[in-house]
Amino acid sequence: MSSRPILDAGPGLNFLALHKERLLFSAVGPLSAPACVEEEILRKAQADSRFEAADRVWRKLSERLMSVLPDDPTAELERAVERISSLPLDERYQRRRDLGETMVVAHAAVAADRGVRMIVLIDDQWGRRLAAAEQRRLERLRSNGRPVGRIDLISTTTVLERAAGSVHLPDRASLRALYQRLRTLDDGLLPLQTTGLLDLPAWNRH
């Protein structure tokens, strides 16, 4: 059993601010996001003109494409947040720094503990380390015979790799242009030449 991938604010802001939501959904399908990630996207879009378009795009997304996961306390979510952050959910929620990444991983962990295969879309290195720690925990449980799911970790690079050769990203020139724009929004993205995206087999079909 699988569920919608869970989106962190960073990739969401970047793709939506550039009006590349069709590329995003064509690559990964319908998405979900914790309530705090929705809040972060809208807050940053209103505060930083570079992300202004993300506000309008987000508000137009239908439930079919984007569902918001409530961050209301449940026993499972509270356990996951405390395990991941070493803080109770209510206290962690008051500390806004890296909250989105924490809640993305926590929601995925709750579903994975129920046997669901989850995907999380995170670029932030700290958030990816959180997800990797949960991956290892689930692997240990599986090795002990527990019927748990798993968490797969993807990134902006994964999205672009899946979109390569499509109408949204037909050739290397379009990739270079888009990646340059993405890096103006997120200086944490690796230089294009180090990602392997320029060497994908998809380009050889054009």
Language-model features: locations:
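Active-site-proximal, substrate-binding regions of enzyme catalytic domains
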Residues: S2-M118, Q125-H206
